[in-house]
UniProtKB/Swiss-Prot annotation:
Protein name: Pathogenesis-related thaumatin-like protein 3.8
Any Pfam family hit: Thaumatin
Organism field: Cryptomeria japonica (Japanese cedar)
Paired cysteines (S-S): 35-224, 76-86, 91-97, 139-213, 144-197, 152-162, 166-175, 176-184
Lineage, opening ranks: Eukaryota, Viridiplantae, Streptophyta, Embryophyta, Tracheophyta
Position of the signal peptide: 1-26
Function: May be involved in disease resistance.
Family: Belongs to the thaumatin family.
Keywords assigned by UniProt, alphabetized: Allergen, Disulfide bond, Glycoprotein, Pathogenesis-related protein, Plant defense, Signal, Stress response
SMART domains recorded: THN
Keyword Glycoprotein applies: yes
InterPro entries xrefs: Osmotin/thaumatin-like_sf, Thaumatin, Thaumatin_CS
Listed GO biological process terms: defense response
């Protein structure tokens, strides 16, 4: 029969393992605004926060959170209750987002599996420059630092942003759906985004733009890196 002291040690060890799993499963994101203008940061999960130049918003993802996305909104106006509108990235007229943002918006995407997977995505278009910076120095820090709006074709341009061809035209060729679901090459439109931001997803099948890092890594997301 196990002694009381042995049982106590087993209990302490079990608690330590449980705490370790919880700690390594939780992830912290520091969202920083380095733009020369106000950005209303958004996250699913997380909600939203107004960030003036130099401000940081911290989002702690609970252990077991499988995916998240973050983006910046511009040209926003909210009342005291948190209701309003944004020129780009609007999420149903709410300061604290519970739904995805309207296109176009530059996205930081995160998925947790056997390790962390993350990417900067222009699949929904572009509104502001963005980077993802892991705390693990061995991991890649992808960024889209260029002002894609400056080279946006007229047919993709909207106030404050540049739509992707998929968002603008909604065709199988540009969205990699239907007959293009299994074989979907880059297009002249996606190459505009890729040439400006080589590390970012430029269209739905641009899988070379996914990066991986060991689980337990924290991240900072920087607007206007």
């Amino acid at each position: 029969m196990a002694k009381v002291s042995d049982l106590a040690l087993l209990l302490v060890a079990g608690m330590a393992i449980s705490l370790y799993i919880q700690e390594t499963g939780a992830v912290k994101f520091d969202i920083k605004n380095q733009c020369g203008y106000t950005v209303w940061a958004a996250g699913l999960p997380g909600g939203g926060q107004q960030l003036t130049q130099g401000q940081t918003w911290t989002v702690n993802l609970a252990a077991g959170t499988q995916s998240a996305r973050f983006w910046g909104r511009t040209g926003c106006s909210f009342d005291a209750s948190g209701k309003g509108t944004c020129q780009t990235g609007d999420c149903g007229g709410q300061l604290s987002c519970t739904v995805s943002g309207a296109v176009p918006a530059t996205l930081a995407e995160y998925t947790q599996s056997d390790q962390d997977y993350y990417d900067v995505s222009l699949v929904d278009g572009f509104n502001i420059p963005l980077s993802i910076n892991p705390t693990n120095a061995q991991c890649t820090a992808p960024a889209c630092k260029a002002d894609v709006n400056a080279v946006c074709p007229a047919e993709l341009k909207v106030d404050g942003g540049c739509k992707s061809a998929c968002a603008a035209f909604q065709t199988d060729q540009y969205c990699c759906t239907g007959t293009y679901a299994n074989s979907c090459p880059a297009t002249n439109y996606s190459m505009i985004f890729k040439n400006q931001c080589p590390q970012a997803y430029s269209y739905p099948k641009d899988d070379t733009a996914t990066f991986a890092c060991p689980s337990g890594t924290d991240y900072s997301i920087v607007f206007c890196p």
